[in-house]
Structure formats: C-alpha cells, structure tokens
C-alpha cells in the first residue's frame, strides 16, 4: 500500500452492475465480474472489499464465488476485506470467528456490527489477533439512517459511536502493549516489515481492530484519532463524498491509517473504464492523505 496508496475498491456484483458488464446474474457471472475487476485493479489499488450480500444471493455457489475472488485477489497481491457486517453473542460469535478467520471464507479482514453489544465481538477480536487478520467494526456508517442510533446520546453525555470507538481504542492499546505473536501480517497488527496498512514506512503500528467511519457527514466522531487501528471510510463517489471531504473529515488520523472506499461510482465505469478511473481516484487521494 505504500506504493499503491490508500484507495479501497468495493466489489459489489449487483444485478445492475452485472448487466453493465454484460454478464448474467448467476454464480458464473459473479466469478467473471470479480475476475474482470481484479484484473483491471491489479497494480492500481492494494485493497478490495467484496460485499458478501451479493454473493449470498446465490447460495452455496455464490459463496464459492466469494472464495474464488479472495484467492484471485490474493494472487494479485491485494488485501481483501470481507464486507459481511457480522455480529452475534456467545457461541454464535465464536462460530462467526471460526467461519471468517479460520475457515475457507477467511479474508484479510472482516467488517462487524457491534449492536448486540461491543464486548460481544470479543471472540472475533481474539480470532483476528491470533490469525494476524483485522476486524473492522461499524461505528459511523455512510447512510443517513444510521445517525438515529449511532449519534444517540448515552447517560454519561457521550454518543453511541464515541463509546464504540473508545472500546476499540482500549482493545488496540492492550494489544499493542503486549509482545507480538505469530500471525499473518494483513490489515491487523503490523508484522515484520510492515507498519500497519501503509506497509513499511512512517505509518504507525496499528491494532487488529479498526472502525468503519463513513466519508459522508460533517465532523467525525470524537476520539477517532486515538483509535489505534484502521479507519475504513466508505461513501466516496456514488454516496456523495468527495476527495476534499475525505481530506477534511480524516485530517486528525495518523498517517496511513485511513482507507477511503469507493464502489458503485468506480464499477459503473464498466470493464473498459475501471482501470483508469481507479487510478485517477487513487492519485487524488494520495495527494491529500498523509
């Protein structure tokens, strides 16, 4: 990522985008779509984010296509974030940890929802640490409907999103204060020769737990700069956020900790325009983010 910059491209094989690529809405169409996207993005971006819901539409064959996109992206030297937003309690959380960090669905990081309780995610946090992967928790989503819950004020005067950020910060501080263990150096804790998501270089060491904080909206949640983990920032392009919004909203974050994400706005360029469009956006982001 030190060479290719911070842009993360979402791979969302919706029926509309499959049609734009002149592909069938089928498992074969999913596989072809993903392979075309990865070929176009290879050497342009370092991180891709397949949206799992579009693969689940096709059942077991769709999940097999998801496994294929993870393998193809890794062969191309990319990191993969599985955008599945999983979250549950007790044994169910353990099962998600097994499926998404130790099983055949495992990518380099998984998105998670904290709304059954932040500490209910602990089995996935521990699995991320143990396997050298990342868990990226939804804190402030890019859709306006999220404000009703995420911006709600708690009895101590803080908001829900601030409370979630604070807990993530505690997890990362504990992890970074402990001796480094074995694991795969991905979007989680920095491994040999890496300095968090930015690769080798001046970026800080980052913990295994990151936050989803949308690039849309005004002032970012208080405490974001002390997160100690990756910030995944969706909403660039089709949802209305601009490169200038990203620069302003995340100016207080450490170098190489922010991953702005664009999906539909780039994919709608089609197979003939994706490579060039992603390259332009990557360069614009690299010019404004440390």
Where are these regions (language model features)?
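Conserved anion-binding
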Residues: 13-16, 84, 88-184, 198-210, ...
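C-terminal helical cap(s) of enzyme catalytic domains, especially alpha/beta-barrels
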Residues: 246-253, 257, 268-290
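Conserved, mostly hydrophobic/aromatic
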Residues: 9, 48, 83, 110, ...
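Short, well-ordered coil/turn segments that N-cap beta-strands
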Residues: 3-7, 43-46, 76-78, 106-108, ...
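A C-terminal functional module that forms or caps the active site or interfaces directly
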Residues: 211, 215-261
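Acidic (Asp/Glu)-rich catalytic clusters
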Residues: 2, 38-44, 70-75, 125-131, ...
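Conserved N-terminal beta1-alpha1 strand-loop-helix module at the mouth
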Residues: 1-68, 72-81, 275-286
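Active-site-adjacent beta->alpha loops and helix N-cap segments on the catalytic face
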Residues: 57-72, 89-94, 116-129, 216-224, ...
């Amino acid at each position: 990522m030190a060479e290719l910059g911070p842009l993360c491209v979402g791979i969302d094989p919706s029926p509309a985008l499959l049609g734009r690529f002149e592909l069938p809405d089928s498992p074969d169409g999913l596989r072809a779509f993903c392979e075309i996207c990865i070929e176009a993005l290879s050497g342009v971006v370092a991180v891709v984010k397949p949206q799992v819901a579009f693969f689940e539409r096709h059942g077991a064959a769709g999940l097999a296509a998801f496994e294929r996109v993870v393998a193809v992206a890794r062969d191309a030297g990319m990191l993969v974030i599985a955008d599945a937003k999983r979250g549950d309690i007790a044994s169910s959380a353990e099962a998600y940890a097994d499926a998404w960090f130790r099983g055949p669905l495992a990518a380099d990081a998984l998105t998670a929802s904290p709304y059954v309780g932040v500490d209910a995610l602990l089995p996935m946090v521990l699995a991320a640490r143990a396997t050298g992967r990342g868990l990226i928790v939804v804190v402030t989503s890019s859709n306006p409907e999220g404000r009703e819950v995420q911006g709600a004020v708690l009895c101590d005067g803080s908001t829900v999103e601030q409370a979630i950020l604070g807990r993530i910060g505690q997890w990362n501080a504990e992890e970074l204060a402990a001796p480094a263990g074995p694991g795969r150096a991905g979007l989680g804790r920095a491994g040999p020769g890496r300095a968090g998501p930015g690769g080798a270089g001046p970026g800080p060491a980052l913990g295994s737990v990151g936050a989803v904080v949308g690039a849309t909206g005004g002032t970012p949640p208080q405490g974001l700069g002390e997160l100690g983990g990756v910030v995944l920032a969706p909403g660039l392009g089709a949802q209305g956020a601009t490169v200038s919004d990203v620069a302003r909203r995340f100016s207080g974050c450490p170098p190489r900790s922010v991953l702005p994400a664009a999906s539909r706005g780039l994919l709608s360029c089609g197979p003939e325009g994706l490579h060039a469009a992603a390259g332009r956006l990557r360069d614009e982001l690299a010019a404004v983010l440390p």
